[in-house]
């Protein structure tokens, strides 16, 4: 039986309760250096009034603290993480070496001394353009979501340049990721949802009905969030372009068609990529991520700058598209993560890239085949082929036994599996969204499927047991309201300290 470690581990600031002065290393007070720099004259306005509130700990204490925390955590190095629409694939460790060459990463480094880094970015621009079927690509954006926002800003400026300010609405699918309507709203657009039909695809009749002169663009994933390929994509492209609107590709689900189908060939005009999903940038912990925004035709003129170009054999960070929306962030993206993606693509090559799309699709459909006889795991359009992910509904378990999707997810935790995404997309009741990715073995998928079958059976025989899960994890069920309420949410040690001192009530 799987059991997670459970340590009564305090915060690192609370480890040294004795107040003893401890150090992980000693600073060498070199007299020769001191004699050369003399007295350091730091302006008073830059000096701290008090010493920094840092924990005084030995190296051993720090190592043990974080190792114990890691034992109470879960990651892809421990087991499968089937979080749907997150593509929690295993990232080869060799990519870490690529990003470890930190001396060439400083954003103010002279171009003459970072030709290798600029060449890498230049090649990535071309590779991502080829992979997506776009004409050009900018890597200036610091994350996938920032790339998405940049794409909507490009749509907005494109219409403004063509005196089409009356286009005030962005369409999004009802299975869309939440960042789609958020990006559109942040750019000042109204948002209108396009409903899915009974087969889980864009309802073409509804689309034809709502597209009009005010439509600025349509944000769509393909495959969609149900794991289904939008088979009418070429017709969708014609409908959107008939009103001079822009077809925007959310790259969140690219893994399922990588190397097999390209957004540009489907009729999309702008593509954003999540390098943390598809191209070996690690997930979790709040970042940093990395993004790419690609475009074709006239829309390349609106890409964020700067872009790398090759001039007389020298790589320069000097390309500024004619109608660029400008910079999305300071300096140039997250270069360390771009190095990870560069090493990943270079190691795989075109054939390896294509195998990602094939194997991720195979893994999903194999899992469906293993679970097809479990009638409590319902599918929209059950006979349709899936791509990168699948969404099951456990509505029957909820209606007949009171066991929810959340309960099933917690029971998976009890068996040493990370939980799938739940209650998304919202068009599926009691949804379990599972994305196995291409890196999981048949044996792992078999174990996952058998465990899910067992949980469904347990839910029918002893539902109370499932509803009490998890029992084998470091922490059981959190009080979500308490954890997120402004009067109790405590994201940092400083907030905790202020709460204890009674100096803060609501976190704004």
From Swiss-Prot:
InterPro entries for this protein: GcvPB, GDC-P_C, GDC-P_N, GDC_P, PyrdxlP-dep_Trfase, PyrdxlP-dep_Trfase_major, PyrdxlP-dep_Trfase_small
Gene3D superfamilies: 6.20.440.10, Aspartate Aminotransferase, domain 1 (3.90.1150.10), Type I PLP-dependent aspartate aminotransferase-like (Major domain) (3.40.640.10)
Pfam families tied to this protein: GcvP2_C (PF21478), GDC-P (PF02347)
GO molecular function, one term: glycine binding
Cofactor: pyridoxal 5'-phosphate
Superkingdom assignment: Archaea
GO biological process, one term: glycine decarboxylation via glycine cleavage system
Catalytic activity line of the entry: N(6)-[(R)-lipoyl]-L-lysyl-[glycine-cleavage complex H protein] + glycine + H(+) = N(6)-[(R)-S(8)-aminomethyldihydrolipoyl]-L-lysyl-[glycine-cleavage complex H protein] + CO2
N6-(pyridoxal phosphate)lysine sites (modified residues): 277
Ranges in a coiled coil: none
The protein's role, per its UniProt record: The glycine cleavage system catalyzes the degradation of glycine. The P protein binds the alpha-amino group of glycine through its pyridoxal phosphate cofactor; CO(2) is released and the remaining methylamine moiety is then transferred to the lipoamide cofactor of the H protein.
Membership in a protein family: Belongs to the GcvP family. C-terminal subunit subfamily.
Quaternary structure annotation from Swiss-Prot or TrEMBL: The glycine cleavage system is composed of four proteins: P, T, L and H. In this organism, the P 'protein' is a heterodimer of two subunits.
Name of the protein: Probable glycine dehydrogenase (decarboxylating) subunit 2
UniProt organism field: Saccharolobus solfataricus (strain ATCC 35092 / DSM 1617 / JCM 11322 / P2)
Gene (name only): gcvPB
């Amino acid at each position: 039986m799987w059991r997670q470690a459970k340590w009564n581990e305090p915060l690192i600031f609370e480890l040294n309760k004795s107040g003893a002065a401890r150090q992980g290393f000693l600073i060498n007070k070199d007299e020769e250096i001191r004699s050369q720099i003399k007295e350091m004259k730091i302006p008073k306005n830059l000096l701290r009034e008090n010493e920094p509130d840092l924990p005084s700990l030995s190296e051993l204490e720090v190592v043990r603290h974080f190792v114990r925390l890691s034992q109470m955590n879960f990651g892809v190095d421990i087991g499968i993480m089937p979080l749907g629409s997150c593509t929690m694939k295993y990232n080869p460790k060799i990519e870490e070496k690529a990003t470890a060459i930190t001396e060439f990463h400083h954003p103010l480094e002279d171009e003459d001394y970072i030709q290798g880094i600029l060449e890498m970015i230049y090649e990535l621009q071309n590779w991502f353009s080829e992979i997506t079927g776009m004409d050009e690509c900018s890597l200036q954006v610091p994350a996938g979501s920032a790339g998405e926002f940049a794409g909507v800003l490009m749509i907005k400026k494109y219409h403004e340049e063509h005196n089409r300010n009356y286009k005030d609405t962005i369409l999004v699918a009802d299975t869309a990721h939440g960042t789609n309507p958020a990006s559109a709203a942040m750019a000042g657009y109204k948002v209108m949802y396009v409903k899915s039909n009974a087969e889980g695809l864009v309802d073409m009749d509804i689309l034809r009905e709502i597209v009009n002169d005010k439509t600025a663009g349509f944000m769509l994933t393909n495959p969609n969030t149900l794991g289904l390929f939008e088979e009418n994509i070429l017709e969708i492209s014609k409908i959107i372009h008939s009103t001079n609107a822009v077809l925007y590709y959310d790259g969140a689900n690219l893994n399922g068609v990588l190397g097999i189908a390209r957004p540009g060939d489907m009729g999309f005009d702008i593509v954003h990529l999540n390098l943390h999903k598809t191209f070996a940038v690690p997930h979790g912990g709040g970042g940093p991520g990395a993004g790419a925004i690609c475009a074709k035709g006239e829309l390349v003129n609106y890409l964020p700058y700067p872009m790398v170009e090759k001039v007389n054999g020298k790589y320069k960070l000097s390309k500024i598209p004619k109608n660029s929306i400008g910079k999305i962030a300071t300096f140039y993206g997250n270069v360390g993560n771009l190095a990870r993606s560069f090493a990943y693509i270079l190691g795989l090559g075109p054939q390896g890239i294509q195998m990602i799309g094939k194997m991720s699709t195979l893994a999903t459909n194999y899992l469906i085949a293993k679970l097809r006889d479990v009638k409590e795991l319902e599918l929209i359009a059950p006979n349709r082929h899936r791509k990168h992910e699948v969404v099951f509904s456990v509505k029957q378990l909820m209606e007949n036994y009171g066991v929810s999707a959340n309960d099933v997810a917690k029971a998976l935790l009890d068996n040493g599996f990370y939980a799938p995404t739940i209650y998304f997309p919202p068009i599926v009741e009691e949804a379990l969204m599972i994305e196995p990715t291409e890196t999981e073995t048949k044996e792992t998928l078999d174990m996952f499927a058998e465990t899910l079958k067992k949980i469904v059976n347990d839910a029918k025989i002893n539902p109370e047991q499932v509803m009490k899960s998890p029992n084998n994890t470091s922490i059981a069920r959190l009080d979500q309201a308490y954890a997120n309420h402004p009067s109790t949410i405590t994201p940092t040690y400083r907030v905790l300290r202020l709460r204890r001192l009674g100096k803060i009530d609501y976190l704004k």
